[in-house]
């Protein structure tokens, strides 16, 4: 199942408080307990969580213009617009950019907190613990503290503790109250302590894939809450990424303090995107050559690279899926690449994009030996695929293989065999590890009967 959030403090029945005192309603504190431990946290939603340690960052010298735009905005004293909206179609690399800038701001000693929404990932798709998670991260980040800012960080912690003592039920109250009491007031104290310190230190909140929040009212409410007022005294910068969905776009359109007009990844010149994609592919192809003898130094060649760049259609997720597909069986990388190159995207023939072609190629290759099976074995293999992949897509939760086995009554061996065949589009590292999709576009592909018809028909 999804990772259980760390509530730090349990709401207890009066009969089970073991001497704890009751403060304001039904929230109990044990004497000597740090109020910060009361804050519910979705650990896996943070950019530096264990679950995200293998997620990619931008390759050096790629997406440089977009990153520089963000960094320049963050350190500009003359720009009081505190929110930066980075939009782009699915697969354009928004989450990778968000992870990269979060790590870079942390390296620059900014106070960084992040929340990466993820559809189908339990607490990570809900906004219920967004502000409490961000507040806890701001209060407990120790790797960014310097001698000049340590007293300011202590002031932030003290302000947050005091807010929780004064109103322990704030974690159950409106998002506006949580925002004001858990984020803005502590950050205002943080900034006040820095007034006499010569530093450009600021707090940076990174909220990725807001459109993947499961509740549309929460999406609107989050934007309205954060954009309601100018925040010059909080030294706060907020980066939000999302697809350019109508709901999100309309919420941003009438907020003058939101910097977003020229920050769509879809507006980046094609030659810039292609240059970044070429660097990405060159780097990954170099690694493949290192693991497979017999490939020439210029493999796969400039002509092939240009074909692949056209197939990418500006989507980094296509390039990532292609490389994972080639890397999962390095001894057959060349033949797999030829299979991809020989496939022609057909408009209106059951799928419509090169990315669909890539997903179809992965599925067809995963089950290409079905022709050698008996009819009953073929039917069983297809049923296993339908039940395993269908459950992962429909249940929309980070299930482990053991939990999925319990729910579907399919053996762990069969589940792991299916997942192993699909490891270029489904991430899974062990029986008890969460199963996650490489990208939300694969869920959308599998869920669209028209787009997957070519595979099912074959």
Question: Each predicted region: which residue ranges?
Answer:
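Conserved NB-ARC/NACHT P-loop NTPase core of NLR-like innate immune receptors
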Residues: 2-458
């Amino acid at each position: 199942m999804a990772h259980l959030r760390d509530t730090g403090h349990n709401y207890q029945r009066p009969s089970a408080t073991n001497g704890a005192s009751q403060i304001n309603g039904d929230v109990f504190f044990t004497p000597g307990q740090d109020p910060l431990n009361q804050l519910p946290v979705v650990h896996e939603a943070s950019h530096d969580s264990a679950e995200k340690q293998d997620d990619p960052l931008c390759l050096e010298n790629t997406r440089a213009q977009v990153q520089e735009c963000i960094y320049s905005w963050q350190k500009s004293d003359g720009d009081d617009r505190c929110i930066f909206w980075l939009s782009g179609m699915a697969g354009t690399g928004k989450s990778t950019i968000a992870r990269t800038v979060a790590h870079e701001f942390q390296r620059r000693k900014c106070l960084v907190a992040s929340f990466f929404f993820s559809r189908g990932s339990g607490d990570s798709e809900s906004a219920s613990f967004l502000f409490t998670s961000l507040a806890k991260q701001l209060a407990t980040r120790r790797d960014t503290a310097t001698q000049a800012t340590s007293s300011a960080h202590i002031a932030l912690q003290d302000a947050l503790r005091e807010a929780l003592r004064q109103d322990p039920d704030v974690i159950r109250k409106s998002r506006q109250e949580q925002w004001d009491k858990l984020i803005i007031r502590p950050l205002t104290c943080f900034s006040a302590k820095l007034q006499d310190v010569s530093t450009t230190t600021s707090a940076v909140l990174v909220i990725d894939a807001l459109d993947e929040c499961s509740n549309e009212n929460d999406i609107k409410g989050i934007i309205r809450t954060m954009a309601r007022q100018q925040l010059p005294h909080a030294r706060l910068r907020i980066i939000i990424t999302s697809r350019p969905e109508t709901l999100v776009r309309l919420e941003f359109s009438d907020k003058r303090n939101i910097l977003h007009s020229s920050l769509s990844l879809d507006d980046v010149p094609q030659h810039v995107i292609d240059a970044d994609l070429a660097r990405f592919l060159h780097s990954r192809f170099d690694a493949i050559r290192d693991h497979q003898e017999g490939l020439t130094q210029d493999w796969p060649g400039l002509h092939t690279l240009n074909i692949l760049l056209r197939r990418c259609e500006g989507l980094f997720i296509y390039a990532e899926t292609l490389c994972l597909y080639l890397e999962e069986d390095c001894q057959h990388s060349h033949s797999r690449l030829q299979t991809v190159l020989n496939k022609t995207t057909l408009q209106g023939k059951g799928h419509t994009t090169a990315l669909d072609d890539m997903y179809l190629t992965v599925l067809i290759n995963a089950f290409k030996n079905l022709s050698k099976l008996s009819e009953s074995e073929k039917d069983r293999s297809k049923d296993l695929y339908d039940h395993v992949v269908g459950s992962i897509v429909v249940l929309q939760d980070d299930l482990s293989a053991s939990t999925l086995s319990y729910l579907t009554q399919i053996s762990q061996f069969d589940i792991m065999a299916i997942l192993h065949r699909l490891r270029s589009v489904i991430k899974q590292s062990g029986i008890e590890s969460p199963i996650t999709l490489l990208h939300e576009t694969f869920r959308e592909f599998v869920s669209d009967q028209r787009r997957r018809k070519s595979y099912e028909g074959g």
